Amino acid sequence: MKNILIILLLVVNLSMVISQPITAKEKDFISLAYVSLSMLNMHKLEASEVKPLLDKYNWNGISDVALINGVFMTGKDGSIITSWNRDEWPAVFDGIDYKGDSIDEQKQREMLCSKKVVKEVVKYFKKKGIDIWLSQTPYCWLTGGSLGAVLEDHEKTMLYAHRLNRFARKFGCVGLDFDFEFPPTERQAQGYRELMQESKRLGMKVSVCAIQPTVDKSYQDNCFPDDAAVNSHEGKYMKWEKIVGEGIVDNINVMQYLAYNSQLKRMDVNVKYEKMSIWEKAYPEEFTSSRKVNMLCGIGYYSFMLPEAKVGKNIRGKGTLNFNQLYEKYGQAAYTDGLVGGEHAVWTTDDVRDIVRTAKAKGWKGVFTWLVTHDFTLEHPLKYNRQQALAEEVENIWKDK
């Protein structure tokens, strides 16, 4: 009888430990990296192959990672879909994406990693002392897909919030990152805020991705000239003033990754700073010690395809390339030249250093990078590596504290 009581107490204590949120380390300056498990093809790996793969990447100067894609998906019934509960999967959402193509949620489901692989990923970063966030995505901008169906139902949203938070805690995540910057309707945006607010109430750290506090025609014309309409929903429905004013989230990750100067035909840090200043002017208190929300500045580790390289809707080159591809094609010029091959604009390592220093000076709480798969590789010389440049600047900030 005594042994049975001991076992019951252990089970109760274990369940309490599992249900408790993991406490994130307080940081003077955050450096977060988005890690897409599916883009790293981890769904094809065995658990024993995880560490050798991640060891190929440069994790210097990183305090947090957000695991995006490949861990879980949202079921339209409010369930958590994983590779290990395949027998419980609900039907996929049937709809059209923003390009007019059929939503292919099934393809994404087939790229979910095994539980053993996910556990190895978590163990890898924990051993490095890196905090882990779990990213919630809709898998379809401007329709929401299955997530959109959940967000349109309040009771389902609350149920899903509890499931999502419990799931994240089981893997030792400190927070949830919400990467659905374009809710297509006011109702879905409301549900999205409810999901974030409930997640924070349940004790998790919460971050949300953003581009602009407001969206106007000038922004659309200058940000993504060919796909301006894709960005028109965010400022219309997200209600950033409510999110900031009520402290619904802990971090806002501002995804102004690139800043193209059409006159210079290259990336321009001054254009980047103009974009950053829109947030600084809209919410000046959030860039002081009195902030309710931490503002993180995004840096894109990929190329911008020059408009001049396009003929109508046809692209003469290969389109936007990641840095592995650029380095293979152009060598060190891909890292030192602002304009590569007459068709790709990129940040140089000097640009990255300048952005990190300026973000800190202007009161941004940190920086984040999109995306691990591109410029984190250790295959290239570190002096040409953007992540190494960022790491050195971030580590200098940490040392000064």
Functional labels for PLM-detected ranges:
Residues 22-274, 279, 291-298, 305-352, ...:
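Chitinase-like catalytic core of GlcNAc-active glycosidases
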Residues 357:
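Histidine-acidic metal/acid-base catalytic patches
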Residues 401:
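Conserved catalytic region of serine esterases and O-acyltransferases that act on ester linkages
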